From Swiss-Prot:
The reaction(s) this protein catalyses: (1S,2R)-1-C-(indol-3-yl)glycerol 3-phosphate + L-serine = D-glyceraldehyde 3-phosphate + L-tryptophan + H2O
GO annotation, cellular component aspect: cytosol
InterPro entries: Aldolase_TIM, RibuloseP-bd_barrel, Trp_synthase_alpha_AS, Trp_synthase_suA
Pathway: Amino-acid biosynthesis; L-tryptophan biosynthesis; L-tryptophan from chorismate: step 5/5
Annotated active site: 52, 63
Taxonomic superkingdom: Bacteria
Gene3D superfamilies listed in its UniProt record: Aldolase class I
Full protein name: Tryptophan synthase alpha chain
Native source organism of the sequence: Streptococcus pneumoniae (strain P1031)
Length: 258
């Protein structure tokens, strides 16, 4: 039976709409983790498809400066993995949450304990950017009988056979990495990016979402045309932190029709 995240995103895709997933850093709020529910409900009310929730880490190798600074602010507010898990247990939302974490915080907490403790929460997906596919067995056995999907990240420089290997049996969605480098580095796209996205889209049997560097209306239109939707992180994190209006951008993303 498909996991909830797969079903919900497939339903959006079947309705002819683009999937939109914003990223937020847990604890990057003037209230710390006490402000997490407020941010989630703000985004939920705008109609987003799912929300990616980052766990702060002191050595975030895949994060650009905006998200790295958000993580440092969160850590300064006292955010810990344990405190985040306890907070997530109290949050009621109808949309799926996807945890983005480096492996070290997960390892320190205990993978099995982490998965068990999230069992009755809205968390339906898990992204671990520094966990190689060959080491997915460190996590996958603990997710097998749960409703949490392990999300594969696929670089668009990866050959088609390797792409197939990475996404075989995957649930939730495929995270297509649009740029070589860290998050937030917009505009530095390969000339053949659209072709590679279209190729990945053809071999995947779950939604393909494009992330890393997606930040403009033009990006939304471009990547919705060749994948099933987009993930936006740095633009959202910066706007929320600085109190900039972001509602119109999100509404445009949510309303995108295929």
């Amino acid at each position: 039976m498909p996991k909830t995240l797969t079903e919900k995103l497939n339903a959006i895709k079947a309705a002819g709409k683009g999937i939109f997933v914003p990223y937020i850093m847990a604890g990057d709020h003037e209230k710390g983790l006490d402000g997490l529910a407020e941010t989630i409900h703000f985004l939920e009310d705008l109609g987003v498809s799912a929300i990616e929730v980052g766990i702060p880490f002191s050595d975030p190798v895949a994060d650009g400066p905006v998200i790295e600074e958000a993580g440092l602010r969160s850590l300064a507010h006292g955010t810990s993995t344990q405190a985040l898990v306890e907070t997530l247990k109290t949050i009621e939302t109808e949309i799926p949450l996807v945890i983005m974490t480096y492996f070290n915080p997960l390892f320190q907490y205990g993978v099995e304990n982490f998965v068990k403790d999230l069992a009755d929460t809205a968390v339906k997906g898990l992204i671990i950017p520094d966990l190689p596919h060959e080491h997915a067995n460190f996590v996958e056995p603990f997710l097998a009988d749960t409703d949490i999907a392990l999300i594969p990240l696929v670089s668009l420089t990866t050959g088609i056979e390797r792409q197939k290997e990475l996404i075989e049996g995957a649930e939730g969605f495929v995270y297509a990495v649009a740029i070589n480098g860290v998050t937030g580095k917009s505009g530095n796209y390969r000339a053949d990016l659209d072709k590679h996205l279209a190729q990945l889209h053809q071999v995947a049997d779950i939604p393909v979402l494009t992330g890393f560097g997606v930040s403009s209306q033009a990006d939304l239109e471009r990547f919705n045309a060749v994948s099933d939707g987009v993930i936006v992180g740095s633009k959202i994190v910066k706007a929320l932190h600085q109190g900039e209006p972001i509602q119109d951008f999100i509404r445009q993303a949510v309303a995108y029709q295929k």
